[in-house]
Amino acid sequence: MPHRLTSFVLAAAALLVWTGTSQARVTKIVIDNKTSPAFCTGSPPVCPSFGDAGQYETLTGRAFGELDPYDPQNALITDIALAPRNANQKVTYIASFFIVKPIDMTKASGVLWHDVPNRGGRVTITTDLRAFGDIGVSSGWQGDNAVATAVPANASSPTPVTPVNNEWVKTPVLSGVHGRIFGRIINRSGFGAAPLNVMGNPIPYFPVNPMSNDGATLTIHTKETVNGFVTEAGTVPNTDWKFCGGGTFALPAPVTTLPVQLCLKDGFDPAKLYQLVYDVTDPYVLGAGTAAFRDVASFFKYEAQDDATPPTPNPLAGSIKWAIIRGSSQSGNFTRHFMHLGMN
């Protein structure tokens, strides 16, 4: 029988146990794919057992949820008051999830590791945790990365969608709402167009007017310290750059798809950082993704079934004693933010 520091697990769980709320909840789940047994290799397939827990299976699916924008636990979400509502006057979301669990749930340990995906990357609990009978859930929270967390076109379909190997969340979009953001371009050279990024991800918003850069400010920076202090080396005149969808300053392609790019008259210098402050339109209510992460864990820990007709049973019902969030790097930043908002 594997051994671990039970007291450590209990202490961590005590700090990070989700509490249920009637004003924010998953109302429906759809299981898109089930592999049982899982982790098989070879031909004919050999399917491993893990300690006393035996064989495992995986489930891929989607959670449909709704948020009461007036509930204090949700009202702290930026711009939720502006979000579109459903017939119940709730704000909705759809989040993907991936479950790793024992086939025989009587062998489950009661510990659920709710892993935070890093830029959409799916997380699978390791073999040592499977040997304990632990359960793993990876679910979507990031609604603004158009690459690894791109939302499937048929995400709202009540029928199964083709499984993908990443996590995503569909959050509300504020149509017609404008706001100011900044983006960066680094390590680029030459006269070709360069995409606007933030933290390595393409910015998923269109400028209010892609044909004009009025009101936008493009600055050049030569140094940045570890504590974020940036040395400004000047401002690029608006006559010397433009929004584009590719090409060059002299022959720009129109802005029709994301990510939005910049074309620079004098070209880009790889030794410099370019930072643009500009107005965009149709932002996401990104905090709904944070609430979705909260609600998915709450559903799997507390609920017996969803609200659909006929209802879909919770595949983890009655098996979870402790739900523990964890993450590192970007996922660690999310975990800290999650706890700071009081969503655990």
Regions found by a protein language model. Give the residues of each.
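C-terminal His-loop and adjacent cap/lid subdomain of alpha/beta-hydrolase
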Residues: A24-N344
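Bacterial N-terminal signal peptides
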Residues: V9-W18
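Bacterial N-terminal signal peptides that target proteins for export
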Residues: M1-V9
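Sec/Tat signal peptide C-region and signal peptidase I cleavage site
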Residues: W18-A24
